[in-house]
């Protein structure tokens, strides 16, 4: 479709809009490389994306990306690269779903993410979750927003074999005078199984509302 280029099994979204992904993409990638002001919605409508050479979903450039799991659909994203859990966990492409911009997970369907390489889902900026059923299993951090993680609602399972369940890493003040590094939970049912910390916030954790949060730390 317009706004998408294809090279083999690599599909690149190049401009703002809504794009629907369905079916099997084996050893392929979905890349977003759009303009700085472009907002993009990726609708997952029953899809399986696996890759052993890079992040299966890699947002290289955009203003904001929403990944919407369509209601009554099951979607999976599997990073099959060999494990690399060194200190470079902030590097580009270091997660099964990796975004250099704000990333929002929405929808009423199910999203299962496996990060065999390093992190599960990571945004270099803010990561937010609303409504969606999401299960993330990763060797390092399951859910990471460098600047912020905001969970409003949904059913979330985060499993980390060697790292943290939910993590922020940047505690600086933004140019709009906002404090970075906060994990905010205002709702949802959240189960975290982590080798290190259930929640590791660079600045602080803010929990309010009527969510359910269970944290188990052990070896998984």
Question: What do these predicted regions represent?
Answer:
Residues 1-220:
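A composition-driven surface/loop motif
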């Amino acid at each position: 479709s317009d706004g998408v280029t294809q090279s083999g099994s690599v599909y690149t979204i190049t401009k703002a809009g809504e794009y629907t992904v369905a079916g099997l993409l084996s050893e392929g990638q979905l890349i977003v490389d759009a303009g700085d002001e472009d907002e993009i919605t990726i609708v997952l409508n029953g899809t399986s994306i696996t890759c052993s050479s890079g992040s299966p979903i890699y947002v290289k450039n955009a203003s904001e990306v929403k990944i919407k799991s369509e209601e009554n659909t099951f979607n999976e994203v599997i990073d099959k690269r060999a494990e690399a859990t060194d200190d470079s966990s902030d590097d580009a492409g270091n997660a099964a779903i990796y975004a250099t911009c704000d990333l929002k997970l929405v929808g009423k369907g199910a999203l299962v993410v496996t990060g065999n390489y390093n992190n599960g889902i990571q945004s270099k900026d803010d990561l937010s979750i609303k409504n969606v059923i999401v299960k993330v299993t990763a060797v390092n951090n399951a859910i990471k927003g460098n600047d912020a993680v905001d969970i409003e609602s949904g059913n979330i399972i985060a499993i980390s074999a060697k790292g943290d369940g939910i993590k922020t890493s940047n505690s600086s003040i933004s140019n709009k005078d906002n404090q970075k590094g906060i994990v905010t939970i205002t709702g949802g049912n959240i189960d975290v199984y982590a080798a290190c910390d259930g929640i590791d916030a660079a600045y602080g954790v803010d929990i309010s509302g009527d969510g359910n949060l269970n944290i188990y730390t052990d070896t998984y």
